[in-house]
């Protein structure tokens, strides 16, 4: 099977133009088919703060009110997505920007209230149009996904970018040899977020559960690792969490294993 690299890049990388441009240059030279999923939470939080709109996070996941959703669509599907697309086009990559609503490529349902926790207008992925995605890839396009989906009934939904990357990897594993890479501003998963030297080179699912229970791993890393291990369980060949500047180096970062 052909190789497909799915990269998720965090908002802390793309919010700084120089760092973003360096990352896009490295992404552009990845051989074979590739897909990029981007976040942008830090930019959304900053905009909400400037507009005096309250934001709330629960276990690393954003609570999405109607006001926050409007900002998310503007920031994610608008500014960030198009800056990435034009950056890659300038590097010779035929980038094509998407939300899940475009061509009905990712359909979600609103997350139900569980244990009295209501995440608001957050979407959990139900279906991905794999046939259409394959058509875009085979025509030489590089899909760039913003973390916005829809429910098929006219409602846009905020969907975790880590989850989108993981779900894309899971459904495409039947057609490609999939490599899934999560990029952010650290070397990889850390024992201590404040200590770069506490880098974990290999993380098993058993260790992940233990670290989660002990509070060693938490916050935004939880949905990232949940999605990553789900993808690994579904047959994705390689899952790595690494620093964006190391995307070219396959041996770097935290490698996950079941």
UniProtKB/Swiss-Prot annotation:
InterPro entries, A to Z? AceGlu_kinase-like_sf, AcgluKinase_fam, ArgB, Asp/Glu/Uridylate_kinase
Q: Which top-rank group of organisms is this from?
A: Bacteria
Reactions listed under catalytic activity? N-acetyl-L-glutamate + ATP = N-acetyl-L-glutamyl 5-phosphate + ADP
* GO BP field: arginine biosynthetic process via ornithine; L-arginine biosynthetic process
A Gene Ontology cellular component where this protein is annotated is:
cytoplasm
Q: At what residues does the UniProt record annotate the site feature described as Transition state stabilizer?
A: 8, 224
Its predominant location is cytoplasm
Which UniProt key words apply to this protein? Amino-acid biosynthesis, Arginine biosynthesis, ATP-binding, Cytoplasm, Kinase, Nucleotide-binding, Transferase
Pathway given in the UniProt record = Amino-acid biosynthesis; L-arginine biosynthesis; N(2)-acetyl-L-ornithine from L-glutamate: step 2/4
Its annotated function is as follows: Catalyzes the ATP-dependent phosphorylation of N-acetyl-L-glutamate.
Identification of the protein by name: Acetylglutamate kinase
EC annotation from Swiss-Prot or TrEMBL? 2.7.2.8
**Record's Pfam families?**
AA_kinase
What GO molecular function terms would the record report?
acetylglutamate kinase activity; ATP binding
What does the entry list as the binding residues for substrate? Answer: 40-41, 62, 158
NCBIfam families attached to this UniProt entry:
argB
Q: Where is the protein found, in the record's own terms?
A: Cytoplasm
What is stated as this protein's family in its record? Belongs to the acetylglutamate kinase family. ArgB subfamily.
């Amino acid at each position: 099977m052909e190789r497909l690299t799915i990269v998720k890049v965090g908002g802390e990388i793309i919010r700084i133009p120089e760092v973003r441009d360096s990352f896009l240059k490295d992404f552009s030279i990845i051989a074979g088919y590739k897909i990029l999923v981007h976040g942008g939470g830090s930019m959304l939080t900053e905009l909400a703060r400037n507009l005096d709109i309250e934001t709330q996070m629960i276990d690393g996941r954003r609570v999405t009110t109607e006001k926050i959703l409007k900002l998310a669509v503007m920031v994610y599907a608008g500014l960030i997505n198009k800056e990435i697309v034009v950056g890659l086009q300038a590097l010779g990559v035929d980038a094509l920007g998407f939300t899940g609503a475009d061509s009905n490529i990712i359909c979600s349902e609103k997350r139900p209230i569980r244990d009295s926790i209501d995440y608001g207008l957050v979407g959990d992925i139900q279906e991905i149009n794999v046939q259409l995605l394959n058509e875009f890839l085979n025509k030489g396009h590089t899909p760039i996904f913003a973390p916005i989906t829809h429910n098929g009934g006219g409602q846009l939904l905020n969907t975790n970018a880590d989850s989108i990357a993981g779900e894309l990897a899971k459904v495409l594993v039947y057609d490609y040899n999939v490599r899934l890479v999560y990029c952010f501003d650290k070397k990889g998963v850390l024992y201590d977020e404040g200590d770069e030297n506490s880098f974990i080179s290999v993380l098993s699912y058993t260790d992940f559960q233990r670290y989660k229970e002990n509070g060693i791993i938490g916050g935004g890393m939880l949905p990232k690792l949940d999605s990553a291990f789900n993808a690994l369980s579904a047959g994705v060949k390689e899952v790595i969490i690494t620093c964006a500047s190391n995307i070219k180096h396959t041996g770097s970062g935290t490698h996950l294993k079941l």
